[in-house]
């Protein structure tokens, strides 16, 4: 990518990267000659050679969707072993289908795992479907959330159908995960579909009546659209939860839409109804987790959950 241009020296200042090459900076002259400026080493050697591709597919209503599929280093494409998979996503609202279908993923970007990334599980033998498109579309006078649940489940089905057709994934061992509004998505999917073996929901909101003056892109208040708030709230459908769910929340979350009460009350409802659920509260953490101890414990909790309820699901059953 171009960072600067010096017309007098006829030089470009550029950053060069690839899926397995850490970004570094160079001068490039108009003849194409490169002069490297930085020599940053790749700190993520364990996932340096994983397979990465942007996959494209269609939803039932014809909407074009995409996601980034990762397979572990050394995956044998001729044998096509069916792997457990983690799907990670975040729903977004749109007012037209063309905007919802835009592809913003670049397969040539360096594979950079952040603290809460699902990519670490590539080293544990999982496939990872990251940045999965989850558009919620409302065109004309229709608002996106008018059929939120239907579109949410349809997005999940389209992604699972695609990876199933590719032949890399065991569709009986798929987990779904998300943070914040992504956690809200997870709880809804586990309540209204049978596609997932387990879920991981971090710092989410599960009772929309506790955010009565709107949330995300929803501008209607509770009193204007009570049925929408009810239908979208996993808390109201806690009796329908079909798969084990891991709830993680910062004990000091001050984000107005995701106070810790959301996870605490949802967990109480799930346990009272006999669901398989675990609640982890991280001390002194807000909406995003910062302390090394918190991040490492979060990763341990997620790994334990995935190993028990996804990878080794058949052995447990």
Language-model features: where?
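Short hydrophobic segments within beta-strands
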Residues: 70, 88-89, 177, 248
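Active-site-proximal cap/loop segments of hydrolase catalytic domains
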Residues: 98, 102-317
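Short beta-strands and strand-coil junctions in structured, solvent-facing domains, enriched
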Residues: 75-77, 95, 254-255
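Short beta-strand element of the alpha/beta-hydrolase
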Residues: 71, 79-93
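Non-catalytic accessory segments flanking enzyme active sites
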Residues: 1-78, 116, 123
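Residues that line or immediately flank small-molecule/substrate-binding pockets and catalytic motifs
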Residues: 16, 29, 41, 90, ...
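Exposed loop/turn and edge beta-strand positions of beta-sandwich/beta-sheet ligand-binding modules
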Residues: 51, 63, 83, 170, ...
């Amino acid at each position: 990518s171009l960072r600067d241009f010096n017309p007098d020296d006829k030089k470009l200042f550029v950053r060069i990267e690839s899926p397995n090459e850490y970004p570094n900076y160079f001068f490039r002259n108009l003849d194409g000659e490169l002069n490297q400026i930085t020599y940053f080493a790749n700190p993520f050697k364990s996932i340096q050679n994983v397979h990465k591709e942007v996959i494209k597919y269609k939803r039932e209503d014809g909407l074009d969707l995409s996601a980034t599929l990762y397979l572990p280093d050394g995956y044998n494409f001729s044998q096509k072993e069916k792997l457990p998979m983690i799907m990670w996503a975040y729903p977004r609202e749109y007012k037209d289908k063309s905007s919802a279908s835009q592809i913003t993923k670049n397969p040539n970007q360096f594979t950079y795992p952040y603290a809460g990334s699902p990519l670490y599980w590539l080293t544990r033998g999982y496939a990872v479907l990251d940045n999965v498109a989850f558009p919620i579309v409302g065109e004309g006078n229709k608002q996106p959330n008018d059929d939120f649940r239907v579109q949410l489940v349809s997005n999940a089905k389209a992604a699972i159908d695609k990876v199933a057709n590719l032949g890399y994934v065991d569709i009986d061992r798929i987990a779904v995960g998300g943070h914040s509004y992504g956690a809200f998505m997870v709880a809804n999917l586990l309540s209204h579909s049978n596609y997932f073996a387990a879920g991981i929901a971090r710092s989410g909101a599960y009772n929309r009546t506790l955010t009565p003056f709107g949330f995300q892109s929803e501008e209607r208040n509770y009193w204007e659209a009570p049925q929408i708030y009810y239908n979208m709230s996993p808390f109201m459908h806690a009796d329908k939860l079909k798969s084990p769910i891991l709830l993680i929340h910062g004990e000091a979350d001050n984000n107005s839409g995701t106070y810790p009460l959301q996870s605490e009350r949802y967990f109480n409802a799930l346990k009272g109804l006999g669901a398989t659920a675990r609640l982890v509260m991280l001390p002194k953490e807000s909406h995003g987790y910062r302390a090394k101890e918190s991040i490492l414990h979060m990763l341990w909790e997620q790994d334990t959950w995935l190993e028990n309820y996804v990878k080794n699901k058949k052995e447990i059953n």
